[in-house]
């Protein structure tokens, strides 16, 4: 007897390849060394490239509004944006993005086959018992390795923990632009209504 599996809940991760008009403006900016992030780091790089910032907001808004939430009039903005560089090949520790709704990572420069994929941890894996599956499926996987190629941008919910493994460094530095997004304007309903335009009076 075959038991039907119902995909009750899914976690959307959006992926699209962008052209040179998105990639080239970022290549002249120095990134943050992956393990030297501090309060002096530049977390607002897109404020220096307002046209690109507008394009990315428009791209994300179309994705989240038309394909995920079906809320065509909801507005969003990018809060923080920063370029990271890994010149040593050291692994990136697992983390998520606080004070953010969605996030993205954009591989705007050359990618080497040695560069490891970004891996997302499955937040729905039960704690305690661990029966190891013999075959990995969407129903039992503990992590998901996102695709990695030049020009690719990945949109994901900010609560997802993610990391990448260590690798042997090459002349091609692993670079990416990270962005955080939040909804703005009015959203919600009833006593859960929020209008960001009134927060500061």
Which residues are covered by each model-predicted region?
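Catalytic core of non-heme Fe(II) oxygenases with the double-stranded beta-helix
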Residues: 86-155, 186-196
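Short, solvent-exposed loop/turn segments at secondary-structure junctions
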Residues: 21, 111, 125, 160-162, ...
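A short hydrophobic beta-strand segment most commonly corresponding to one strand
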Residues: 103-106, 171-187
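Non-heme Fe(II)/2-oxoglutarate
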Residues: 1-73, 82-84, 89-91, 117, ...
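A generic structural micro-feature
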Residues: 75, 96-100, 169-173
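Short beta-strand His + acidic residue motifs that chelate non-heme Fe in jelly-roll/DSBH
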Residues: 92-95, 162-170
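Short edge beta-strand segments in beta-sheet-rich domains
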Residues: 11, 78, 115, 141, ...
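Residues in well-ordered beta-strands of folded domains
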Residues: 17, 82-84, 105, 119-121, ...
């Amino acid at each position: 007897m075959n038991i039907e599996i119902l995909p009750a809940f899914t976690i959307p991760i959006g992926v699209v390849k962008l052209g040179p008009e998105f990639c080239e403006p970022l290549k002249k900016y120095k990134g943050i060394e992956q393990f030297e992030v501090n309060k002096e780091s530049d977390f607002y790089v897109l404020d220096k490239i307002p046209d690109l910032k507008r394009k990315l907001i428009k791209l994300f808004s179309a994705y989240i509004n038309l394909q995920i939430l079906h809320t065509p009039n909801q507005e969003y903005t990018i809060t923080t944006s920063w370029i990271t560089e890994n010149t040593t090949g050291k692994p990136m520790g697992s983390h998520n993005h606080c004070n953010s709704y969605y996030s993205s990572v954009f591989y705007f420069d050359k990618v080497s086959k040695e560069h490891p994929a970004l891996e997302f941890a499955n937040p729905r894996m039960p704690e305690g018992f661990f029966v190891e599956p013999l075959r990995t499926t969407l129903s039992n996987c503990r992590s998901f390795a996102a695709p990695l190629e030049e020009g690719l941008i990945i949109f994901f919910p900010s609560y997802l923990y993610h990391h990448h493994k260590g690798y042997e460094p090459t002349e091609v530095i692993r670079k990416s632009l990270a962005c955080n997004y939040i909804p703005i304007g009015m959203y919600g309903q009833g006593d859960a209504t929020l209008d960001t335009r009134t927060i500061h009076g």
